[in-house]
């Protein structure tokens, strides 16, 4: 390819046919070489830059059951601090009960198709309500994390019927520290306690949600409520938790006050206990509730190791991003060093809802972000923590490199054309005239040289003739 371009440059550079082809070909070859080499180098530079940028932006995918593909899940993984045994901000709910209430602003109440909840706790109660999320007045949607007969369970309703899921094998009212993780995707739900297997719940009438969601997009907006009512009459499971208004922690309002320790609550990206410790304006605290500066005393290195094994063996639902590996993923054994208090870092999630199937409020993703675990006192983050970078930015380096290479090549080509067009044409004409004169002289000389023998012969002949006449 390179040699072919050089030959083309040589042909373009030759002024005439065969006589001036040598000098013109050399100039054309040099001209082609002048812009081909920078073009190649610029292209390689752009590709290398784009490849390096592409390699720096990576996203991990963890897939669970295939039944959860109806909704894209933002994140559901235990962060590094929980895997290492750090409980986060901790509150003690004493005898008589207390309550921490978070209220969304009236104009910022989210409606979600997927919810994520995680919390650490220790208690000896057989009956209590830990966390409850309620929708606006009159809607009736709710989600409740509770203890019933010493077992942890979740009950929720998003417009159809109450759906319950419970871990019946784990006893959690033993005074030890436990971590519970709950996810909801439409009417589907999963629940996990510590390192126990994940419990999954798929209610009836929820198998055709994907097809119904596609069909729902083609239904005119004015007919949305009619279609929803018809689907509801047919027993279809609704999926959106509409207009979430309050998060109630402690269960005092429900008549089953919690007594014990609650740590590091996360709900759809909200670090509620951390916000309470910072005296957030949207949070109210009543009753016998106090903030403590250390993790639950009942937590031991054995429970830490259990949580680490749970993280390494568990993959809950489909995810599109994750935190970086921690000491547990690297296989380091649990240490017996004293554990310092950290910020809430059990779970950060962002519930998403690509399409709405209920005509009450437009579905809006909750305002949540991904938080990196930090050491106590606001020092540097734990080793292994990483920022989440979206996949859409992974091609930025490639595009910038290609554009820069193309611009550089165009500039070089324009400069070469400018130099080629403005070179000294007088010298070319002088050289051409000289060649022409010399060629003419040479050709005339050749003709003269060729004719000299014939003229000599004629003179000799005349001389002989004269001699003959003279002698005769």
Curated annotation (Swiss-Prot):
It comes from Homo sapiens (Human). This is Neurexin-1-beta. GO terms for molecular function: calcium-dependent protein binding; cell adhesion molecule binding; metal ion binding; neuroligin family protein binding; signaling receptor binding; transmembrane signaling receptor activity; type 1 fibroblast growth factor receptor binding. Neuronal cell surface protein involved in cell recognition and cell adhesion by forming intracellular junctions through binding to neuroligins. Plays a role in formation of synaptic junctions. Functions as part of a trans-synaptic complex by binding to cerebellins and postsynaptic GRID1. This interaction helps regulate the activity of NMDA and AMPA receptors at hippocampal synapses without affecting synapse formation. NRXN1B-CBLN2-GRID1 complex transduce presynaptic signals into postsynaptic NMDAR response. Residues 1-50 form the signal peptide. One of its GO terms (cellular component) is endoplasmic reticulum. Belongs to the neurexin family. Residues 51-396 are extracellular. It is a single-pass type I membrane protein. Residues 418-472 are cytoplasmic. Residues 205-234 are annotated as: Essential for interaction with CBLN1. The modification Phosphoserine is found at residues 454-455, 458. The gene is NRXN1. Ca(2+) binds at residues 141, 158, 240, 242.
């Amino acid at each position: 390819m390179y040699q072919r371009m050089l030959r083309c440059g040589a042909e373009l550079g030759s002024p005439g046919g065969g006589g001036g082809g040598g000098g013109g070909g050399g100039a054309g070859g040099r001209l082609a070489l002048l812009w081909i080499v920078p073009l190649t180098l610029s292209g390689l530079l752009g590709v290398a830059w784009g490849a390096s940028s592409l390699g720096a932006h990576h996203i991990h995918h963890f897939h669970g059951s295939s039944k959860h593909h109806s909704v894209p899940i933002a994140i559901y993984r235990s962060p590094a601090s929980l895997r290492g045994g750090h409980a986060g901000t901790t509150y003690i709910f004493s005898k008589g009960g207390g309550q921490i209430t978070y209220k969304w602003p009236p104009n910022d109440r989210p409606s979600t198709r997927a919810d994520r909840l995680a919390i650490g706790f220790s208690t000896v109660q057989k009956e209590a309500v830990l966390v409850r999320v309620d929708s606006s007045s009159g809607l009736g949607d709710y989600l409740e994390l509770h203890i019933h007969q010493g077992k942890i369970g979740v009950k929720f309703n998003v417009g159809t019927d109450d759906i319950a899921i419970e871990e019946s094998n784990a006893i959690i009212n033993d005074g030890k520290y436990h971590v519970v993780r709950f996810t909801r995707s439409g009417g589907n739900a999963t629940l996990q306690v510590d390192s126990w297997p994940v419990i999954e719940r798929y209610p009836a009438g929820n198998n055709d949600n994907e097809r119904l969601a596609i069909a729902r997009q083609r239904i005119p907006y004015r007919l949305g409520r009619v279609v929803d009512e018809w689907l509801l009459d047919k027993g279809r499971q609704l999926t959106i938790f509409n207009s979430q208004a309050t998060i109630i922690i402690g269960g005092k309002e429900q008549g089953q006050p919690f007594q014990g320790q609650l740590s590091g609550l996360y709900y759809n990206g909200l670090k509620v206990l951390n916000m309470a410790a910072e005296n957030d304006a949207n949070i109210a605290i009543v009753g016998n509730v106090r903030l403590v500066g250390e993790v639950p005393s009942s937590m031991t290195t054995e429970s830490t190791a259990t949580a680490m094994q749970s993280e390494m063996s568990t993959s809950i639902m489909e995810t599109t991003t994750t935190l970086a590996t921690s000491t547990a993923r690297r296989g380091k054994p649990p240490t017996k060093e004293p554990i310092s208090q950290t910020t809430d870092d059990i779970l950060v999630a962002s519930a998403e809802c690509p399409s709405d199937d209920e005509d009450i409020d437009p579905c809006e993703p909750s305002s949540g972000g991904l938080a990196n675990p930090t050491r106590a006192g606001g020092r540097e983050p734990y080793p292994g923590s990483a920022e989440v970078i979206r996949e859409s930015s992974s091609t930025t380096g490639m595009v910038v490199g290609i554009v820069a290479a193309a611009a550089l090549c165009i500039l070089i080509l324009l400069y070469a054309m400018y130099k080629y067009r403005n070179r000294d044409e007088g010298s070319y004409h002088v050289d051409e005239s000289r060649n022409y004169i010399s060629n003419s002289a040479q050709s005339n000389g050749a003709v003269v040289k060729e004719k000299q023998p014939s003229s000599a012969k004629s003179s000799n002949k005349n001389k002989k003739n004269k001699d003959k006449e003279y002698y005769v």
